[in-house]
Design a protein with these regions (language model features):
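Acidic, proline/glycine-rich low-complexity IDRs
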Residues: 1, 125-175
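Short, extreme N-terminal segment that most often corresponds to the first beta-strand
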Residues: 1-36, 163-175
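Phenylalanine-focused residue identity feature
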Residues: 18-19, 69, 96, 116, ...
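Low-complexity, serine/threonine/proline-enriched polar segments
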Residues: 27-140
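A sequence-composition feature that detects small, non-aromatic residues
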Residues: 8-11, 17, 63, 89, ...
Length: 175
């Protein structure tokens, strides 16, 4: 599966923003910095004209395109809300409570249904979102603050000294 994420970075220009993300995604030993993804394309990948080549074309500068920057943040919020609504429709809290009781009754062993059931998976996914963990469902990462929380970039936009160096860099992650 593929997911388009936007990373917030501070840089002097579009090129620097792009290279910050490109450089940081691969660790010194060659592993991907994002542990849930096996490969990625910086610049939008399948959402861009470049497809599978890194490209700076879709990088958004707040200084050059403040409205588009804010629109992208609002779109990310909407995507996150949609994910949470999907989880809300799928989670069965009564079943989860029953699974916990059964686990305790079964000497700390999950049943086959518990091990392979989707209810626990949706609950885990929901908890990760509530904790601002960086997952395929985050759609956003703040590389300045090292978090999936979106509030910090919005605070930086309100700071008169910092909005002009804010960039959103798109990444097509495969997982």
């Amino acid at each position: 599966m593929h997911t388009l994420h936007w990373w917030a970075v501070e840089a002097e220009d579009r090129d620097e923003a792009f290279f910050i993300v490109q450089d940081r995604l691969l660790m010194e030993d060659g592993r991907n910095w994002v542990d849930w993804s096996d490969w990625h394309v910086v610049g939008g990948g399948r959402w861009s004209d470049s497809q599978y080549e890194d490209s700076k074309d879709m990088v958004i500068s707040y200084a050059e395109q403040p409205e588009l920057f804010k629109e992208r943040l609002e779109l990310i919020k909407k995507l996150r809300i949609d994910e949470m609504n999907n989880n809300l429709a799928k989670v069965n809290l009564d079943q989860f409570t029953s699974d916990m009781v059964d686990y305790i009754s079964n000497s700390g062993q999950p049943s086959k249904e518990q091990r392979f059931g989707l209810n626990s998976w949706y609950i885990k996914r929901t908890a990760e979102m509530l904790q601002d963990s960086y997952t395929p469902d985050s759609y956003f990462y703040d590389f300045v603050e090292y978090t999936a929380h979106m509030g910090y970039v919005e605070e930086r936009l309100d700071n008169p000294e910092r909005p002009l160096i804010q960039f959103l860099v798109p990444i097509d992650f495969h997982f």
